[in-house]
Structures are given as C-alpha cells and as structure tokens.
C-alpha cells in the first residue's frame, strides 16, 4: 500500500523552503494559530468506498505538537486484507515554521507489518530513518531550514493557501527529498462533500508524469475538506471530510 500522501502529499501522500512564491507581506495577525483538532474522512478509490481515515493534531508538552493520519480498510478487499496505515510526525511550531522532529509510519495487513521511524536532528543538520526502509533511504540526508514531512506540508497548505498564490515546499520524508509546488486557483469554487456545501479553494500540486494531487481548502476549517490523488487520470485515493472538531 502506498505511503499516505497527501502526504507525501498527505497524502500523505509534500518544500525549496517554507516560503511561497510570490509571497505578500505577512504580519503576525495573518498567521493562522495552530490548534488541536480531530477530523474524520471516508476513503474512496475509483468512486467506491474503501474505508475510513482520521487526521488529528495533538498538543504535547514542551511546546511540541503531533500530527497523525490513520487509514483503515472497512469494505471489500481492503477490509478482508486488514489494511491499516498510520503516519505521525512530532514537530515544533514557531510562527510560520513547522519543524519536524520525529516521524513514524506503520503499514499493516492481516499477514504483514512494516514500520519506519525517522529522526530529524537539527543540531547535526541531518535526518535518518530505520526499520523497514531501503538501505538507500536510511540517510543521513542534509536538512535545510523549512524542510517538512508530507503531513506537515498538508498543514502548511491549509495555513498558506490564498487565491492565485503559488506555494513551494521541500519534502523530506521516509528517506526521500523532493521539491513540491502547489498552485491555488484564482477563484474559489463550490464543492459538496458528504452532503455539505462549501466555498473552497482548489489547490493543485504541480507534478511531472501521470500523477495528480488536488486539495480543497476552506478558510476557518483546520483540515482539507477533500484530498484527491490520481494516476493516469484515474482516482487512486479520495479522502472526503465527514466531520471535524476542536479538542
């Protein structure tokens, strides 16, 4: 099963730096305040419901935070196979900077379990991974200011999205480094998710090849209302918000 991207996206399965291009002047009052929340999603593939997902942000001691994304197969072959995937990133936040400290990924089925743990050592300026990861991806990888995991990039997109804006981030996650570029549509669009109508900003990740990632963002909602990943024009993962609440 693929890493959760919009990450990588999300999801799972997504930084250049934590700056945006172009970037209007930002004041302290413009920066969205990070707050804990729990959001529930239904997961679709090819238009068919496969399971459920939960994204949450948790406040920790010592001014640290944790963001989690958990997916569980509840229907069809995904349920029979016991598909269960989890990603977490512990991080600190200083204004507009979300700095990853540790990362964990667990993928489970009835017969298998794979786990990867990553450590972002900012004093040493490098990141390393251990567990069920290819030797070529264990690191160390050199860190740059603004580097983020895929889950943190999801939060950054929510924070930074404005109509017509271009967002650039450097993704450092699971032993890989990639530059991620997103473009926010000039005009908001009407979107219906789980029977609820929203006026949302469409954010497209600019990718090469046959992959496409789209995130829909609503002002005042701390999590994407929809996260869609496509390959060759076909939906591979589609997370649609059911509900969210502050904690």
Name each region found by the language model.
Residues 6-7, 17:
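Cleavable N-terminal signal peptides
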Residues 13-14:
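N-terminal signal peptide c-region/cleavage motif recognized by signal peptidases
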Residues 21-122, 157-247:
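Acidic, serine/threonine-rich low-complexity disordered tracts
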Residues 1-4:
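Positively charged n-region of N-terminal signal peptides that target proteins for export
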Residues 109-152:
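Hydrophobic, well-structured mid-protein blocks that either form specific transmembrane helices
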């Amino acid at each position: 099963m693929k890493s959760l991207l919009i990450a990588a996206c999300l999801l799972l399965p997504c930084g250049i730096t934590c700056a945006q291009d172009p970037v209007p002047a930002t004041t302290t009052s413009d920066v969205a305040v990070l707050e804990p929340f729990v959001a529930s999603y239904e997961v679709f593939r090819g238009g068919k419901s496969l399971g459920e997902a939960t994204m949450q942000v948790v406040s920790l001691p010592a001014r640290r935070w944790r963001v989690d994304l958990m997916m569980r197969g509840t229907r069809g072959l995904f349920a029979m196979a016991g598909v269960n995937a989890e990603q977490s990133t512990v991080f600190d936040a200083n204004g507009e900077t979300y700095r990853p400290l540790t990362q964990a990924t667990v993928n489970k089925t009835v017969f298998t379990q794979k786990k990867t743990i990553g450590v972002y050592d900012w004093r040493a300026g490098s990141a390393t991974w251990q567990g069920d990861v290819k030797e070529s991806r264990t690191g160390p990888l050199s860190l740059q200011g603004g580097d983020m995991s895929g889950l943190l990039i999801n939060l950054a997109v929510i924070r930074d999205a404005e109509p017509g804006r271009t967002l650039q981030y450097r993704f450092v996650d699971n032993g890989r480094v990639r530059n991620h570029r997103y473009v926010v549509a000039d005009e908001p669009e009407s979107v219906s998710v789980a029977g609820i109508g929203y006026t949302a900003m469409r954010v497209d990740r600019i990718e090469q090849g046959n992959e496409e990632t789209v995130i829909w963002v609503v002002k005042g909602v701390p999590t994407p209302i929809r996260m869609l990943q496509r390959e060759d024009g076909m939906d591979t993962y589609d997370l649609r918000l059911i509900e969210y609440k502050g904690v």
